[in-house]
C-alpha cells in the first residue's frame, strides 16, 4: 500500500529543485530504509546492458507519441553509439515494478550500465541506485540526467551532494493522505514555492 503520494502544482512532474532541509528525506528513509542513497556504483559492477524503460499509456497520450515507434526509434539511435545489449522493460502495474521487480533490483541483477527512458520515474530510480539515466521529456531528474544518447558510453552522473540536494527537495513533494487532509501539504507547497511556473496553454 502506498503511504506517500507525489503532489505537483502547475505540472505533471517537478522539473526543477532548490535547497531544502533533509528532515523529510530522513523521515522517508525511516519508513523505507531502501531509500538510503550510497552514491555512484563502481563501474566494474555495472558494465552490462542498457535498460530501455518504455513509457506507459498516459504519457504517450499526454505527449502524443506512439510507444512502439518511440521504442524502435530509440533503439536505432542507441545503436549508433554502442554495441551493448539493450533490454526493453515495459512498465507494468505497481506490483510488477516494486521490491524484487523494481528498476533498482533489475539494475543490480543485470549489471545495467545506464537506463534510458522517455520521462518515467525509472530515471530517478536508476540514479538513486547509482547509475546514469537518459531522459527524453520533462521529469524530476531533468537537471541532472543525460539528454543526448551520443553520451551513452560516457554518461554524466551527478556529484553525491548534488543528487542528495535533489532527494531532499523531492521528499518535500511527497505527502501522506493525513498531511493532505490537515493542510500541511498545501502549506509547504505554497510557503516554500515547491513548484514550477504555471504551464502556459
PLM segments and residue spans:
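Short catalytic/ligand-binding loop motif for oxyanion handling, primarily in non-cytosolic enzymes
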Residues: 3, 59-62, 94-97, 124-125, ...
